Amino acid sequence: MKLKQLLQNIDYDLIKGDININIEGISYNSKKVKQNYVFVSIKGARFDGHDFIKEAAQNGAAAVIIDEDFHDSIENTTLVKVKNSKVALACLCNLFYEEPSRELNLVGVTGTNGKTTVIHYIRDMLEAFGNSTGTIGTLGYELKDKEINVEKINPTTPEALELNQILRDFIDKGAKNAVMEVTSSALMKHRVDYCSFKVGVFTNLSQDHLDEHGTIENYKNEKIKLFKMCPVGVINLDDNIAGEIIEKGTCEFFTYGVLTNADLTASDMVYKPNSVSFNVHYKGISSKVKVNVPGEFTVYNVLAAIGSLLCLGIDFESILKLVSSIKPVLGRLETINNPLNKNIIIDYAHTPDSLEKLLIMAREMTNGRIITVFGCGGDRDKSKRGLMGMAVGILSDYCIITSDNPRHEKPEDIIRDIERGMQTINSSYEKITDRRCAIKRGIEILKEEDILIIAGKGHEDYQIIGDNKVHFDDREVVNELLG
């Protein structure tokens, strides 16, 4: 494809060279550049692509995209300046891979909590309906039975290059639908620009990622961007910012909720240790459904999934038959079966709100104690640590504060931040920095009717310590300890 074709939808200045050259690939990593590639210089948190332009040229880049002045000389390489390299990357990748999102029923799910669960519920129901569906999110990307098994990705919403590659791969393998998590970071960094979403979904909003966004207002506004990129938005009307999304979004809206007069509602919930059943109501039709996943948030996640399928044109009565196909999601309310019949749940909850909801649900499941093992990630929103400590301290009978992914912080410093929240409500807790030892301690003090909640990492099979990923899997540790 000609560089001129790839640049057709953005404003640019040709600094030098020829835009009628053939482009055979795109990269924003200078080390991955090959002959006749275009290298897009992106400024990240730790590295600036403009510092690697010479390396990209030496590796064969036919063209380089920049968004700031570049004064060094590079021979035989076209140089193009744009306003924003991240926007340019999304534009170029969309065209280079022939606008893959337009060939799919693409559903984007945003919100603080529930994104991973909702995309898998939507996938489970669409697959049961006979529609091959790919997923992209925290657990990786996957297209079941189509030679694309779970492939890990980082971050949750891939960079525009990888995203368009994955979508094109889905299409080549026969997918008709794709469901993806759309993070606030991805929206802010233009990773999903030029994506053609059929449906956008909003789950909820609570404090998270303030290290990146600065304020909850900025965080919220990034989420709202999705509803200017799709024809219809499926939103949780019970959430505090639902009205603002409707006011600021430019799409049509379909609402769901329990507490409000939404388009799709639920009532008469019956919560059991391993399931929830409830009546679902839509346009005068009511039906009882049961899902083999417990908790109030399961009701909301199921409603979000049902609403998404309705907006994709599937009729309500057909959808009701698909609800039973919903399966538990890895690391989300995951019960660890064990020979000693200990009540142990592993969950990804890592915000004050998600921990609160998890522990409220756990209280409904037991007459015994709730013992919670948890920590907070390093190099992330420090302001939520005390709030998480307070939530766990109030709703647990005993807490063990430990390490999560400390990254470049000292685990002891993170634990102290959590501890300050616990001290405000005089909770019972102890501190064990080593996560394996903390889990071991939790199991040791667990009595017959107690529940042990191991929170924060869920599906993750690693700890990030400094710049290194060290293998660590909560479920493996539990199984080893219980032997």
Swiss-Prot record:
It is an enzyme of class 6 (ligase). NCBIfam families: murE, PRK00139.1-4. The gene is murE2. InterPro entries: Mur-like_cat_sf, Mur_ligase_C, Mur_ligase_C_dom_sf, Mur_ligase_cen, Mur_ligase_N, MurE/MurF_N, UDP-N-AcMur-Glu-dNH2Pim_ligase. A motif (Meso-diaminopimelate recognition motif) lies at residues 404-407. This is UDP-N-acetylmuramoyl-L-alanyl-D-glutamate--2,6-diaminopimelate ligase 2. It comes from the Bacteria. Meso-2,6-diaminopimelate binds at residues 380, 404-407, 456, 460. The modification N6-carboxylysine is found at residue 223. Catalyzes the addition of meso-diaminopimelic acid to the nucleotide precursor UDP-N-acetylmuramoyl-L-alanyl-D-glutamate (UMAG) in the biosynthesis of bacterial cell-wall peptidoglycan. It is found in: Cytoplasm. Gene3D superfamilies: Mur ligase, C-terminal domain, Mur-like, catalytic domain, MurE/MurF, N-terminal domain. It catalyses: UDP-N-acetyl-alpha-D-muramoyl-L-alanyl-D-glutamate + meso-2,6-diaminopimelate + ATP = UDP-N-acetyl-alpha-D-muramoyl-L-alanyl-gamma-D-glutamyl-meso-2,6-diaminopimelate + ADP + phosphate + H(+). Belongs to the MurCDEF family. MurE subfamily. The keyword Cytoplasm applies. It holds the Pfam family Mur_ligase. Carboxylation is probably crucial for Mg(2+) binding and, consequently, for the gamma-phosphate positioning of ATP. One of its GO terms (cellular component) is cytoplasm. ATP binds at residues 111-117. Keywords: ATP-binding, Cell cycle, Cell division, Cell shape, Cell wall biogenesis/degradation, Cytoplasm, Ligase, Magnesium, Nucleotide-binding, Peptidoglycan synthesis. GO terms for molecular function: ATP binding; magnesium ion binding; UDP-N-acetylmuramoylalanyl-D-glutamate-2,6-diaminopimelate ligase activity. UDP-N-acetyl-alpha-D-muramoyl-L-alanyl-D-glutamate binds at residues 30, 156-157, 183, 191. GO terms for biological process: cell division; cell wall organization; peptidoglycan biosynthetic process; regulation of cell shape. Its cofactor is Mg(2+).
